[in-house]
């Protein structure tokens, strides 16, 4: 009996030594790993919103605060690391490769969400929407945050140039459309994807806008992309593809020659899958590469 006990203890001791050595080996291997840094986390205290907001920042290769180079800025709604920040940043980096050279090196500002239903919607007259979106209707405050706090903050802290782009999908697309129609001068380029124009029974489509008038002289490029999305979650039946087309038709009626509108229908994508492909297409349409041959 004693013999078996001693033998078992020897086996156990041997196994423990093997596990310890394997653990030390794994620790040694992982200790040589270095973090892969894609961007930086910044914060801004907003008086307009009454809260602190997280910003995910991508700075292009070669960026230096002490340099005199200034970069276009892309403002990305739904810009958390677990939303659209990582893959959209990758698209801009890819399209900036020297053998592609479709977009210039750019600063990406991902605006992390707190309450997108609150921030991306204007007040609605539809009771069903009021009941379902109980915090909704504060987009004016969020637009004020972008205009009066965020853009000045980015301009002051980073080497931001004059060119500004906004990207928004779904309710983010609704907000981008509202800014386009109400405060178009905030951005030079608008990438609007699957906009939730059904909100408030499509009242945004009835809005008059300075960009439709001949005396609006700021050059604007607008991309509107939509997939095969079908019925919107609205009280009155609305089809999202139709609403997107109505927005395009509204903009193309403008007598303003400085407004350039690009419509993109992606029938192989739906509301959940469209963003990545649409942003890629938008960069191609808004920034055509001249023939190098």
Q: Where do the language-model regions lie?
A:
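Non-catalytic cap/lid and distal C-terminal segments of serine-dependent acyl enzymes
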Residues: 28-293
């Amino acid at each position: 009996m004693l013999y078996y006990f001693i033998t078992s203890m020897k086996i156990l001791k041997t196994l423990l030594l093997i596990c310890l050595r394997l653990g030390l080996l794994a620790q040694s291997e992982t200790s040589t790993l270095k973090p892969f840094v894609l961007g930086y986390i910044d914060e801004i205290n907003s008086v307009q919103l009454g809260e602190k907001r997280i910003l995910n920042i991508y700075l292009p290769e070669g960026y230096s605060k002490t340099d005199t180079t200034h970069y276009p800025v892309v403002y990305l709604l739904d810009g958390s690391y677990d939303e659209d920040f990582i893959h959209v940043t990758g698209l801009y980096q890819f399209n900036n490769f020297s053998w592609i050279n479709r977009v210039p090196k750019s600063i990406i500002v991902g605006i992390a969400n707190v309450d997108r239903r609150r921030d991306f919607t204007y007040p609605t007259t539809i009771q069903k929407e009021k009941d379902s979106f109980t915090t909704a209707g504060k987009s004016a405050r969020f637009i004020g945050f972008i205009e009066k706090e965020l853009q000045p903050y980015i301009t002051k802290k980073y080497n931001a140039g004059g060119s500004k782009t906004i990207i928004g999908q779904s309710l983010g697309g609704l907000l981008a459309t509202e800014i386009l129609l109400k405060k178009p001068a905030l951005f030079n380029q608008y990438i609007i994807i699957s906009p939730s124009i059904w909100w408030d029974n499509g009242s945004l489509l009835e809005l008059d806008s300075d960009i439709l008038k001949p005396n609006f002289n700021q050059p604007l490029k607008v991309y509107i992309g939509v997939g095969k999305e079908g019925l919107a979650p609205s009280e009155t039946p609305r089809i999202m593809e139709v609403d997107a087309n109505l927005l395009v038709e509204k903009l193309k009626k403008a007598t303003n020659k400085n407004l350039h509108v690009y419509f993109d229908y992606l029938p192989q994508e739906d509301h959940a899958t469209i963003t990545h492909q649409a942003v890629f297409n938008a960069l191609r349409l808004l920034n055509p590469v001249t023939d190098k041959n």
